[in-house]
């Protein structure tokens, strides 16, 4: 069982690429085969990296970007169906708290589709750049659900 937990951690971390260039930390959603759909583990990895950057004096800004042709398809529905963590200690809330409380410039470089959380997370960014062909959508609104 421990090896499964270790694999889950390292597999998730591999879906979030981290690169520091000078004083800028770039976090890249790197799951293009799934349109960068975000899993619980990816949320936790993002939260951890953003929280670390908040207290690192060598990092002056964070850029969130993506690989492939989509920024993100939103939440990975299969992952959330199998493990629906939604309390304040959940990875999703950890991520939202991290970006909401981040004391330095938070920048998003968006291309392709930004679905669900891919759109709502942008409201917490200080600057958002988007390609001209970027499509923003919040499908949960058509169900009468608004998370904000």
Task: Report each predicted region and the residues it spans.
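Hydrophobic/aromatic residues within transmembrane alpha-helices
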Residues: 27, 64, 76, 121-123
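Conserved CoA-thioester-binding segment of acyl-CoA-metabolizing enzymes
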Residues: 4-67, 97
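Glycine- (often His-adjacent) and acidic-residue-rich active-site loop
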Residues: 58, 65-101, 114, 144
